[in-house]
Regions:
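Core segments of cupin and vicinal oxygen chelate
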Residues: 2-3, 9-53, 87, 93-95, ...
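Vicinal oxygen chelate
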Residues: 5-13, 39-42, 46, 59-84, ...
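Active-site-proximal flexible loops/turns
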Residues: 18, 84, 116
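Short beta->alpha transition motifs characteristic of CBS
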Residues: 52, 117-124
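A short, acidic/glycine-rich surface segment
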Residues: 55-60, 125-126
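Polar/charged alpha-helical tracts
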Residues: 80-83, 87, 129-133
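Short, compact, well-ordered microdomains
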Residues: 91-119
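A short, polar/charged loop-to-alpha-helix boundary motif
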Residues: 121-136
């Protein structure tokens, strides 16, 4: 089996709000139809799908309805990412210390899906080196 693309798909009752939020967070754009929106990142890669779920009930992290899935967005400037997320309609759920060398904050997107903004995690080259040196 060859996987040619993997995409996270969120349910949402308000397709335009949810897809616009994620397109703005990723610096990308949205392709729309009546029941499914495709979110592309700034480089034009298909990253997120948003499907119409008129009766969608958002997760209530951490205690209520289960979160099902969440995204981690790793950034170099956590304060700027926080400001952008909140300006776009994210709701902070759990604070983190943006002055710490490594950490994360938890938010809910407009449809209530939790996501994290993290910083100080290994860069892609470090991850590739680790995987190259630790394969069986």
């Amino acid at each position: 089996m060859e996987i040619i693309r993997h995409v996270v798909v969120f349910d949402a009752a308000d397709l335009p709000a949810e897809s616009a939020f994620w397109a703005a967070m990723l610096g990308g754009r949205v392709s729309t139809d009546d029941s499914f929106h495709t979110v592309f990142d700034a480089a034009g890669n298909w990253r997120i799908g948003v499907q119409l779920a008129p009766n969608h009930q958002p997760p209530d992290w951490p205690d209520g309805l289960s979160q099902q899935v969440h995204l981690d967005l790793h950034v170099t400037d956590p304060a700027a990412a926080h400001a952008r997320a909140v300006a776009l309609g994210a709701r902070p759920l759990k604070d983190g210390d943006p002055t710490a060398s490594e950490g994360h904050r938890v938010y809910a997107d407009p449809a209530g899906h939790p996501f994290c903004i993290g910083w100080g995690h290994p860069d892609d080259d470090t991850v590739r080196d680790f995987l190259r040196n630790h394969t069986d």
